[in-house]
Amino acid sequence: NILSYSIKHRNERRMYIYPTDQAPYWGSGRFPIGKFMNQETTAMMGSVGVACKLSHSVMYLKMKRVERGRYEMTFIPICMDASKTTPEEIMRKYYDLLEEEIRETPENWLWSHNRWKW
């Protein structure tokens, strides 16, 4: 359980990387976050809820393809203290950054994958 692990290690410097999905699996808790790529979209809020409870910083990881098999990664701050905002605001900002990245480099997006299965 990530929450109990995070609480146990809250005084240690750690980085947690949480995946997210536009089609959360059944039973994970689906929360509407508005439009993403012109589609009504839901998101999993568990990990961002942990960040809010523990006052974590939240970053977006932007990946830029430099050449075949080589990428540059840049952390873009979404918020420095998640307890000062809401999970919905954090996820909205995340999806805004993701959509911006997709529009900048559409060739890196897997267009054949159905991302809205609900």
Model-identified regions with their sequence ranges:
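Non-catalytic C-terminal accessory region of glycerolipid acyltransferases
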Residues: 2-118
